[in-house]
């Protein structure tokens, strides 16, 4: 799927009703297991982060087992848990603590190993979408793109989120697209 096709698909999906949504879920289930830019292991670890955030014990068990089967290391599993810790500590609303939280996140997320930072941002984007937290979505989308995650890789995260969270994810697709448009506009103007 090309970026334009994915973008069009996501725009349409945000306006669908229940039957269309169920049809999409069937397609997404198949799509999420296909080979793409993200490895199967990355997808499992991101999905594990979502399962932990949602506190779904059955999902945690399934995705922990699958990530381990795909040779995820204890270090990688630890990164998922640390991202979850940070995401759960996010200030709510218009808190004065937001800027301090962002600085703490950036200190944690920074790594000399670029792939670690990319991975942390991808897990954070997925959780931000489930949280329906616009500031988080914008922050993690911008950070991910800045460290080399492609928009296509980010679009591969959306089906995982939809499979774990269902219909509420649809309300965040316009937010994700708006943040991406803002990011590209800012890059073009700088």
Place the predicted regions along the sequence by residue.
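Membrane-interface alpha-helices at helix entry/exit sites of multi-pass transporters
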Residues: 77-80, 153-157
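Short N-proximal segments of mature Sec-exported proteins
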Residues: 44-54, 120-135, 158-164
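Conserved redox-active cysteine motifs that mediate thiol-disulfide chemistry
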Residues: 57-59
């Amino acid at each position: 799927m090309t970026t334009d096709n994915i973008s069009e698909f996501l725009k349409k999906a945000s306006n669908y009703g229940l039957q269309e949504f169920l049809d999409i879920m069937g397609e997404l289930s198949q799509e999420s297991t296909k080979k793409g830019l993200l490895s199967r292991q990355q997808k499992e670890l991101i999905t594990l982060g979502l399962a932990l955030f949602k506190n779904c014990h059955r999902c945690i068990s399934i995705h922990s087992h699958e990530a381990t089967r795909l040779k995820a290391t204890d270090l990688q599993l630890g990164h998922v848990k640390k991202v979850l810790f940070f995401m759960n500590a996010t200030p709510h609303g218009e808190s004065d603590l937001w800027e301090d939280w962002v600085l703490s996140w950036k200190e944690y997320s920074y790594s000399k190993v670029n792939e670690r930072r990319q991975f942390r941002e991808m897990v954070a984007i997925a959780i931000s979408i489930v949280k329906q937290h616009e500031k988080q979505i914008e922050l993690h989308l911008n950070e991910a793109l800045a460290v080399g995650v492609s928009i296509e890789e980010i679009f591969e995260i959306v089906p995982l989120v939809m499979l774990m969270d269902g219909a509420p994810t649809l309300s965040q697709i316009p937010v994700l697209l708006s943040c991406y448009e803002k990011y590209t506009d800012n890059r073009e103007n700088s």
